[in-house]
């Protein structure tokens, strides 16, 4: 499978995945998709299938927030494409949850056919090359956090965060780690 200069697969893509897992992943990454994008590709979600790992990776990125997740898939041919997040999410959410979803893209990576027991859909997307790369953390300290402690801390603070996108600074919570504890 050919790679582009950014290490992404290009060309044909063929895979089968679970509707329930894909729907959950789309709901997650769609939170990072721009509602009024400055560039058309930012309204899309990047789907990248890897036959070597048997995983389908989904990425949403609005140039300030990026979310990436992956799910198990039966990948016959590795490839990547970007598809309109809203439309893809609406289609996938309406498909039967007990039916697998088949994806087949064209050679150019601009159109995909999505097939399940509920029907067949054709979507036009954009090449994966057009999607911006997520920034990488170049320096920092890795840490392990007890998931239960993190959930407890977030539940105790998230009520105070704003849901108003106009006040972006207030939509999150501040976490501080001192090596032994989290605050």
Language-model-detected regions and their locations in the chain:
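Structural preference for solvent-exposed beta-strand-turn elements
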Residues: 1-183
């Amino acid at each position: 499978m050919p790679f582009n200069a950014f290490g992404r697969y290009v060309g044909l893509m063929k895979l089968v995945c679970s509707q329930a897992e894909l729907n959950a992943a789309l709901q997650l990454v769609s939170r990072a998709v721009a509602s009024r994008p400055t560039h058309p590709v930012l309204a899309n979600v990047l789907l990248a299938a890897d036959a070597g790992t048997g995983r389908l990776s989904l990425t949403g990125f609005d140039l300030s927030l990026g979310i990436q997740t992956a799910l198990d898939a039966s990948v016959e041919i590795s490839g990547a494409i970007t598809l309109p997040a809203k439309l893809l999410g609406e289609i996938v959410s309406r498909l039967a949850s007990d039916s697998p979803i088949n994806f087949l893209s064209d050679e150019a990576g601009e159109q995909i056919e999505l097939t399940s027991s509920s029907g067949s859909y054709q979507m036009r997307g954009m090449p994966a090359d057009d999607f911006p790369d997520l920034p990488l953390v170049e320096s920092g300290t890795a840490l392990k956090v007890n998931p239960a402690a993190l959930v407890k801390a977030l539940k105790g603070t998230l009520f105070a965060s704003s849901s108003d996108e106009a006040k972006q600074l207030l939509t999150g919570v501040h976490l501080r780690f001192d090596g032994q504890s989290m605050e």
